[in-house]
Swiss-Prot record:
Catalyzes the formation of 6,7-dimethyl-8-ribityllumazine by condensation of 5-amino-6-(D-ribitylamino)uracil with 3,4-dihydroxy-2-butanone 4-phosphate. This is the penultimate step in the biosynthesis of riboflavin. This is 6,7-dimethyl-8-ribityllumazine synthase. The active site is at H89 (proton donor). 5-amino-6-(D-ribitylamino)uracil binds at W26, A59, V60, E61, V81, V82, I83, F114. It catalyses: (2S)-2-hydroxy-3-oxobutyl phosphate + 5-amino-6-(D-ribitylamino)uracil = 6,7-dimethyl-8-(1-D-ribityl)lumazine + phosphate + 2 H2O + H(+). (2S)-2-hydroxy-3-oxobutyl phosphate binds at G86, T87, R128. Keywords: Riboflavin biosynthesis, Transferase.
Amino acid sequence: MSGLGAPAEVLPPVAGMRLAVVATRWHAEITDALLAGALRAAKDAGLAAAPAVVRVSGAVELPVIAAALAARHDAVVALGVVIRGGTPHFDYVCQFVTAGLARVTLDARVPVGFGVLTCDTVEQARDRAGLPGSSEDKGREATLAALDTAAVLRDLELAG
């Protein structure tokens, strides 16, 4: 993970896990890079089966699709970009998406990696998308966090 105080990257034990990734189509340059980072992370972690990938129109659609995917996967990653504009719409979308994805995680007991960039500018989003020259790769980070949490949940269930 990136940023001040971030832990060292951990490749979790993923044997037998099923991963799904849902990504928006808005800001395709950025969401495509986030998706590429997520898929690289899944491969680097040693996931045997390729992740299921679903594209949706926008960020508001992420929670309902994440909920459907959580029913059939051990972990889900949600990827998108919301850029602040001149109206309160940004705040409403960000609140809806954040609360919706948290609800999916808690209701389904399936981790949802939060790879939704909520930025003031497109430049900030690009810097977090894993593009050449980016300082961060939030698609990768969200994927590894979701897989790590799924591994912890699996260990807790096995421990009884």
